[in-house]
A protein has these predicted regions:
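Secondary-structure "cap/kink" motif recognition
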Residues: 1-307
Length: 307
């Protein structure tokens, strides 16, 4: 009797064990059949010094050069966007495999219309994958180069379109800081308005900003003005068009020209642009400028005279 009871308990335990194994195998949690979370980051990001993002006619190359990232070896990259790029590479994880019914078609789309993201350490390729998504930009997919199984991607805890950072055109990678210079080398600022009576110049004299012709300037206002100018950032850059080129031939609302002790000149011409402002930089780029940040920079000369 006892022996029969023991056998029955053993059978029950074996059945329970089998159920546990099956539950673990087919549960929604990770199993041996799931793709590992680091499947698309099998590289050391600290060693990456070049990132190439290639798509149809929109190649972008980010190179680390002399403590700064450069875009296509033409201009400095926006530091904030570079941080977003590396955060995406570090945190993006496969959420699940793409269903077999759409695997082949999505693989073809990613290879033909997606962005090929390649990471390098010197001349050595550390990794590469295709990035893309649906038309609504609500679902992102990655496909490792040489593979035929795409994955739906996500950043745990966030609802973002993961592939968006890889799809930016080169112009949007440009440093958004308008006057990207070492302000300790500042020598002179010339500010001109449509009404010449408001024009003024700022120079450095004994390590202090002064306005020639103004015996006693309001230093608090002047220093705030210079701080605001040094921190002015573009919301975005625009590709050149005939309409923008035509606008640039008209008289600007304001023009700022900064020179440093090395003889380099940085300029900005400002125009009305819908509910914002449009700036034309010394590099010939059209920049959309936030209205709330530019209005304080339209102060005329008399504003800085101490009362």
């Amino acid at each position: 009797m006892q022996e029969t009871r023991n056998k029955r308990q053993i059978i029950i335990l074996l059945v329970l064990l089998a159920c546990i194994v099956l539950a673990l195998t087919f549960s929604p949690g990770r199993s041996s059949f799931d793709v590992p979370p680091d499947y698309y980051r099998e590289f050391n990001l600290r060693e990456v010094d070049r990132v190439e993002m290639k798509s149809a006619g929109k190649d972008v190359s980010l190179n680390f050069n002399n403590s700064r990232w450069q875009v296509n070896n033409e201009f400095s990259a926006d530091r904030g966007l570079v941080e977003v790029l590396f955060a995406t590479l570090q945190q993006a994880e496969p959420k699940r495999r793409v269903a077999s019914s759409m695997r082949d078609s999505l693989t073809r789309v990613l290879r033909e219309k997606g962005v090929l993201v390649s990471l390098f350490n010197g001349e050595n390729k550390a990794g590469a994958f295709f990035a893309g998504g649906n038309a609504a930009k609500t679902q992102a997919y990655f496909l490792k180069e040489g593979d035929d199984q795409p994955h739906l991607m996500a950043i745990p805890g966030y609802r973002v379109y993961v592939s968006g950072i890889f799809e930016l055109p080169a112009i949007q990678w440009r440093e958004k800081l308008i006057f990207d210079l070492n302000w300790t080398n500042f020598r002179k600022l010339e500010t001109n308005f449509r009404n010449p009576a408001g024009n003024f110049t700022v120079e450095m004299a004994r390590n202090q900003a002064v306005i020639p012709g103004v015996a006693e300037p309001d230093t608090a206002r002047l220093n705030t003005f210079l701080d605001d100018l040094s921190l002015l950032r573009a919301d975005e850059y625009l590709e050149r068009t005939r309409a923008l080129d035509s606008m640039s031939q008209s008289q600007p609302l304001a023009e700022y020209q900064i020179s440093d002790i090395g003889g380099r000149v940085y300029s900005l011409r400002v125009y009305d642009y819908d509910d914002k402002f449009l700036g034309l930089t010394h590099a010939g780029q059209f920049a959309v400028l936030p209205r709330e940040h530019l209005i304080p920079l339209l102060r005329p000369k008399e504003f800085f005279i101490k009362r």
